[in-house]
Swiss-Prot record:
GO molecular function: BMP binding; BMP receptor activity
Record: glycosylation sites: 47, 173
Main subcellular localisation: secreted
Name of the coding gene: Sostdc1
Function: May be involved in the onset of endometrial receptivity for implantation/sensitization for the decidual cell reaction. Enhances Wnt signaling and inhibits TGF-beta signaling. Directly antagonizes activity of BMP2, BMP4, BMP6 and BMP7 in a dose-dependent manner.
Any Pfam family hit: Sclerostin
Similarity comment text for this entry: Belongs to the sclerostin family.
Annotated disulfide bonds: 75-133, 89-147, 100-163, 104-165
The name this protein goes by in its record: Sclerostin domain-containing protein 1
Domain CTCK: 75-170
Regulation: induction: Up-regulated by BMP2 and BMP7. Down-regulated by FGF4 and SHH.
Species in which this protein is naturally found: Mus musculus
Amino acid sequence: MLPPAIHLSLIPLLCILMRNCLAFKNDATEILYSHVVKPVPAHPSSNSTLNQARNGGRHFSSTGLDRNSRVQVGCRELRSTKYISDGQCTSISPLKELVCAGECLPLPVLPNWIGGGYGTKYWSRRSSQEWRCVNDKTRTQRIQLQCQDGSTRTYKITVVTACKCKRYTRQHNESSHNFESVSPAKPAQHHRERKRASKSSKHSLS
């Protein structure tokens, strides 16, 4: 058994050792938890972000689709060059006019389209109504005709200068003529029947 003086000298040593142990445990726990990384909740990647990355950052909104469904439409204009003749007389210079024919098509499809046009309308693909190209503007032009006898004639003709798209429905194709109701004709009495009736009456009297 140790003397009391040794016990007193061991107490401070035990206290120092206990402090060091606590400090070691605290340091270890702090070091341990410092390396723990909290799990970050993974955000589900939406289809829009994937499409944006694949398409080079382009956004496709619903408004863009709506605009594509309704596009401007215009006529397919044709230029015609012809000579006017009347009997033995023919025009000296050819006549250039505009022919409005064919269907109405979206403007980007039409040839020589530069981003606009006269007489454009909005055309919907879902619409059951049909658009047709018709004459819009005309002007009167004088043209001279040269005859074989050396004389000249001057004529006034109408030339088309602009076309437009006109909407036609099924009712336009149906005939709009109102037929007048014909009253039923009264049965005409023949003269022979009258004569027979008169003869029968005479025989009955006799």
